[in-house]
């Protein structure tokens, strides 16, 4: 069987969709699985174990000058790449026109199909015109966790919904080049403070207070950043917190994942890096400043927890949660 995953963006959603790959291999051990994803995320997706091909697409970049000669040539080259193989199943995990447009361009084997969501789910992006582009609409619950939604879409599209597999926690599997557990004695905590949504942010004063608590407990801090505003923020923090706070350079997502995987864990807001912490199997506290933990928070792991909800958590709640996950991690995965 040959299966194509179409999940283009964004970072957190792409990472959560990775849980589908082990499910597919459990049900179809000989399946060849390809993935179409935005070019910025392709190096990270290439680290997922069990993929045959990763097909990068430049939709975000193309939109800036859609009719330029260069972008027209790139789109034609991508179309040729997409047409190289025929698929038994093409599954659009995005449910948007931009992703259905990609899925609709694929070649199918005899009896092959193209599937996506048949309806919207709460707090999930969805565009109804996908019905006009693809041929199999899969009904979904009105309220469901994002990871469960991706896994259920694959299961219903490929007729294994009744398998006990879906009752088990999501799994993420990485190639050997992506470390899977903190290094022995790791003392560096990653503060994943960045987010594209202002309503997801946690107060800077609380981050600084938490940083001091971690340093007082003998930990170092890693400060990743993306963009000028986040870089200015971590520069301020490093000046206040001192040499124990390391500003990480901007780096590719695959390299960043390897650096995170060698840390003692991650404390972060609802963002792509927090979802990456979950997928890497790290001790993790995820901070929510709105009622979204039911949809996006970590599940099924004692050393990965969500704090907050309709209101942001206090710094003490985050600190207590961090101590909790450290204890749970030591019990479940002793050195």
Regions found by a protein language model. Name each.
Residues 1-335:
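Catalytic machinery of carbohydrate-active enzymes
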């Amino acid at each position: 069987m040959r299966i194509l995953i179409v999940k283009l963006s964004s970072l957190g959603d792409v990472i959560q969709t990775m849980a589908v790959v082990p499910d597919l291999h459990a049900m179809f051990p000989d399946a060849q699985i390809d993935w179409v994803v935005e070019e910025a995320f392709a190096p990270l997706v290439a680290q997922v174990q069990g993929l045959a091909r990763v097909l990068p697409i430049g939709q975000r970049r193309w939109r800036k000058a859609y009719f330029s000669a260069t972008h027209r040539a790139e789109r034609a080259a991508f179309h040729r790449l997409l047409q190289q193989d025929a698929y038994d199943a093409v599954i659009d995990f995005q449910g948007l026109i931009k992703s259905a447009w990609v899925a609709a361009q694929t070649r199918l084997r005899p009896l092959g199909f193209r599937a996506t969501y048949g309806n919207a789910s709460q707090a999930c992006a969805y565009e109804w015109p996908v019905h006009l582009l693809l041929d199999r609409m899969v009904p979904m619950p009105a309220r469901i966790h994002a990871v469960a939604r991706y896994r259920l879409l694959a299961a219903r599209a490929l007729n294994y919904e009744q398998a006990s597999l879906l009752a088990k926690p999501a799994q993420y599997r990485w190639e050997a080049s992506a470390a899977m557990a903190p290094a022995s004695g790791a003392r560096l905590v990653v503060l994943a403070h960045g987010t594209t949504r202002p309503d997801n942010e946690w107060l800077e004063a609380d981050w600084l207070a938490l940083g001091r608590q971690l340093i007082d407990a003998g930990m170092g801090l890693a400060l990743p950043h993306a963009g000028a505003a986040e870089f200015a923020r971590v520069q301020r923090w490093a000046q206040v917190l001192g040499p124990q706070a390391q500003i990480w350079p901007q780096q590719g997502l695959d390299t960043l994942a390897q650096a995170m995987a060698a840390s003692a864990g991650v404390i972060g807001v609802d963002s792509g890096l927090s979802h990456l912490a979950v997928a890497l199997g790290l001790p993790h506290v995820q901070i929510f400043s709105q009622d979204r933990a039911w949809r996006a928070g970590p599940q099924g792991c004692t050393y990965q927890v969500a704090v907050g909800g309709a209101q942001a958590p206090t710094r003490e709640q985050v600190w207590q949660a961090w101590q909790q996950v450290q204890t749970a991690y030591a019990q479940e995965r002793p050195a």
